[in-house]
């Protein structure tokens, strides 16, 4: 479950980076 949360954060960060 903890890994899932980390993955979600990474995905969110990646999305922001892609948008930028």
UniProtKB/Swiss-Prot annotation:
GO terms for biological process: response to antibiotic. Residues 1-20 are annotated as: Disordered. Coiled coil: none annotated. Keywords: Antibiotic resistance, Leader peptide. It holds the Pfam family Tet_res_leader. The keyword ATP-binding does not apply. This is Tetracycline resistance leader peptide. The gene is tetL.
